[in-house]
Amino acid sequence: TGAQLLYGGDAVIAVDAHSNEMVNGLNESGKLPVKVVYKGTANSSKEVEAVFKAANNDEKCIGVITWMHTFSPAKMWIHGLQQLKKPLLHLHTQFNKEIPWDTMDMDFMNLNQSAHGDREFGHICTRMRIRRKVVVGYWKDEDTQHKIAVWMRVCAGWADSQDMLIIRFGDQMNNVAVTDGDKVEAEQRMGYHVDYCPASELM
């Protein structure tokens, strides 16, 4: 979850509580095939970088979901995004479904700036040409949860492919630059390790 310290410690505590509630709600919805694990609120460039590095190094992590509860200055996301190797989903939502017009004050407005923060995050991702899935909608809505679930299944397939071994029998070994060039590209782009076995191995 993205935030910042500008609005004080109470705001950060509220962001943390709301984020936990959202993650628990998503996991308890029964709509998601993979468990979402909350990794805390990132309030600085170093904290963002630490979260993304941890995601890269965690074999159980198949993707990262980001959400900006309040305004999170996007320059602090640059170094983390440059290092992220896992699939990324940007969840453009807000904690409250309805705006409390009768009771809304500046504290509420400072705390709940998803529209501002998510737009800022979307800008830096586009500026950096970061490949990502963007899901827009209220986090409790089934349609939103369905879109997250579809992305999760794609991530699961991607994660499985990272250590996949493919055997090609009777491979074409003439003009190796072409055939092995495709194998190199398959491993570089998709994680598929392709080996050759002669057709006699099938006998």
Residue locations for each model-derived region?
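Metallocofactor- and cofactor-centric catalytic cores in central/energy metabolism, strongly enriched
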Residues: 1-203
